[in-house]
Amino acid sequence: MAFIPQLSIRRVLLVQFMASSLLLGQQPQPISSTPENAKSPAARKSMPGMSDDQMSGMGSGMMELMQQMHPKSLLQQIQHHASSGTSAEPNSTPTPMLMTMKGEWMLMFHANAFILDTQQSSQRGGDKLFSTNWFMPMAQRELGPGQLTLRGMFSLEPATITSERYPLLFQQGETAYGVPIADGQHPHDFFMEIAGLYDIRVGEHRLLNSYFALIGDPAIGPTAYPHRASAFENPVGTLGHHQEDSTHIANDVVTVGMTHRIVRIEASGFHGREPDEHRWNIDQGKIDSWSTRLTLQPGQNWSGQYSYARITSPEALFPAEDQERMTASLMYNKPFSNGNWVSTAVWGRTRSLSDSSKENSYLLESTLRFAKQNYAWTRLENAGRSNELLIGEHPLPPGFSEAPLTHVQAYTFGYDREFGRIPHLASALGAQVTAYGVGQPLQPIYGSNPVGVSIFLRLRAISKDDR
């Protein structure tokens, strides 16, 4: 895929993004994000924000777009394009959003934000008030024989997370100004995604899709943690981020894929270097890495994937080191009256192609929504750590060689409850606590049982039917 002219991709996507921004500048009047059957007269009447003339003027293709908001098949789930990159979640997974029609365009808006205070024990722990957040405008329409989707994703974390980090005990793999970030997670870039997607149906059960992104998420790993339904109530990152989904913000991404019934195969080319510490700009780089992903969706409530990638020079501190990454995940979602239960299991492995050293991570997370306004969740992790943690936030010594050291465990449990809402914005107050299991080599630094506590306010864009 490296033969595709990089400059042309950038120009095309910038034009697409500008068009999407202009369209999304119109004031939306939200409609239901989950119509049961957009083709029925009853369902048409149940879509607020759309006039009778709008509904009667909708063609079959536009009605199909409406049906994709409540997908019944893997093909519809893919064309929904509500997760990160081109990843898929179970068909039954809820997707809070605002949505409206503007001429031939369906306009959507997703957003999730936390304002939280975190406090951690141990001499390496930290205390901080900060905000993690993202928002995603989308526009879809029929174009030629297929469907065009324009999508942007943005974060204000460069402003709401100061000093290049927020406290996260045992986190590693991050870098700022030539120094490792130890026990902290860096903010996301302001530009998380600028992408155009095009899908073509080839018969009733087959779909061809393409994805072009100045900044985006290649076909590697599960849905990235900020956008994963099972992690939606958890305000902080995962310890296994660099083994599982750290490529979710990559530069110059090109993905092609084919779906047949319940099976999908994809391949991506992208620039392997992770974003630098300059969080407001758009990084550049040639396509030098590749990945492939197999997705299987054996029913409404299940989704699984296996993926493999070769990544060129991802880490700024080790520019001569290329990496191999493998991930596998299984996601389950079960809707029920006044609630929903969603769970994800993830395995990730990163192997250095210089010395064949490996780091594995394992994650199990689950979120239960019950009695409409209540959420309880857990995240259990077992993550490999390297000797870089022993150095802390200091320049690496001359001749330093990174090597696997031990595993750490993180056990997180949380609860929040939604309270009075203003139109199209759900608010919740919550807290979570994390207890850590520490490998013997790290106990002299961290102690044997450090803990962390977070108290937060969560804000989310919703339609009235998401309540």
Task: Provide a role label for each language-model segment.
Residues 413, 447-467:
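Outer-membrane beta-barrel "beta-signal"
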Residues 260, 264-268, 295-400, 411:
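Detector for outer-membrane/organellar transmembrane beta-barrel domains
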Residues 109-111, 150-152, 210-212, 256, ...:
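Membrane-embedded beta-strand positions of outer-membrane beta-barrel proteins
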Residues 107, 144-149, 204-208, 262-266, ...:
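Repeated loop/turn-to-beta-strand initiation elements of outer-membrane beta-barrel proteins
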Residues 161-295:
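Surface-exposed coil loops of outer-membrane beta-barrel proteins
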Residues 113-119, 154-160, 214-218, 260-262, ...:
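Transmembrane beta-strands of outer-membrane beta-barrel pores
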Residues 139-143, 200, 257-260, 296-298, ...:
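Residue-level signature of outer-membrane beta-barrel architecture
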Residues 105, 127-135, 188-194, 248-254, ...:
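Residues that define the transmembrane beta-barrel architecture of outer-membrane proteins
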